[in-house]
Amino acid sequence: MAYTNENQQLMQKLSGEISKVIKGKGEAVQLILTALLAQGHVLIEDVPGVGKTTLAMALGKATGLSFRRAQFTPDVMASDITGFTMFNREENRFEYRSGLVMTNILLADEINRTSPKTQSALLEAMEEKRVTVDGVVHQLPEPFIVIATQNSQGYVGTCLLYTSDAADE
């Protein structure tokens, strides 16, 4: 991929900031920064304790973009990700309460520990750059990037990632 001079400078600056926090992951840092510039998403798979979460958090801090972390456990629900509507008695109307995806960078930590329904909600937001809650469409902020981590298969509590039909086409 060819970078403009401006993008090269930005990548060098961000790489320098991230390398203050995490060492020995130069290639991973470059790949994540490339995904950031391309407004793509990243899936990092490795064994526990090697710095996956630290790397994603360092990127969030270095960019200054809005950042949220979601720890994907079996009890996380799709509405935690997308948001939900709630009745406001004082105003006598329903209001949208934003979910974790309403951020620029979402760290989806250990996504293979949550249910396929919750994974599906995240995948839809990643692909569509929007969520639909109770028939109302809510656009995600620009840029919207997901850095997802997963532990290698075989670790206790992990399950296969949901694969959509679109991925098979």
What are these regions (language model features)?
Residues 66-86:
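AAA+/P-loop NTPase substrate/partner-engagement loops
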Residues 162-169:
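Conserved small/polar residues in nucleotide/adenosyl-binding loops
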Residues 103-126, 158-160:
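Conserved AAA+/SF3 P-loop NTPase catalytic/coupling segment centered on the Walker-B
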Residues 95-104, 133-150:
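AAA+/SF3 P-loop NTPase mechanochemical coupling elements
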Residues 8-41:
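Pre-Walker A (pre-P-loop) alpha-helix and adjacent loop at the N terminus of AAA/AAA+ ATPase modules
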Residues 79-100:
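Short glycine-rich substrate-engagement loop in P-loop NTPases that contacts/grips substrate
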Residues 38-72:
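Walker A/P-loop
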Residues 120-139:
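Conserved catalytic/switch belt of AAA+ P-loop NTPases
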